[in-house]
Amino acid sequence: VELRRTMRAAARQGGDAHHLARASARTKRRPIVVLCDVSGSMDRYSRHLLVFAHAIGRRERVETFAFSTHLTRITHLLRHGDIDAALDHVAAQVHDIGGGTRIADALHTFQRDHARRVLGHGAVVLIISDGWDRGDPDQLGREMARLRRSCHRLIWLNPLLGSTVYQPETRGMAAALPHCDDFLSAHSVEALDALGKLLADLPRRVSRSARGAAGGLAGHGGTAAG
């Protein structure tokens, strides 16, 4: 699936992406892991961003987690075809929606319980949060450093970047930022389109079938393109 066009369509159509371009079968998109902050300070953004995660999760290899004071895997909840039903399931299962924020604790739980399974094959991790955090900033820095070592690319999406006066000076954001490959906004269609372009431009993984074909060519004295 052509990721950038899928993401743009999802953003513009409120989560539905029906018109898709197909990418080459010889390469595969990197898996995406979404860690979405659903704490009280993110109330005005959470639904919009979960709609977006729902849309790309139906078309791409995506694992999605929600966090506030605890981490909850919601991948299976977002697979429901109807977005309103999917979000109702999320609201019923994620018991700390609208609560405080413990980003470091959420990352620790993710890396202890889920990272080995979902960070293979050069995954790209998207953390969606405003960076307001009640935890220990030093712990957050350590967890971010560990996460960065485990993934292909670590991207932080902060909806507050849509404001021209915003500065990432909270303790949590300041601790996390040095470990991010990219620091982007997530407040508008245009911001999500920029994210789609970034992800679409990342080097793809060569599929197993393509590697097998390349090996066959090499065995017969041919040359395969990388």
Regions found by a protein language model. Name each.
Residues 33-47, 71, 132-135:
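Short acidic, Gly/Ser-rich segments with clustered Asp/Glu that frequently serve as metal-coordination loops
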Residues 44-47, 51-102:
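Metal-dependent catalytic core segments for phosphate chemistry
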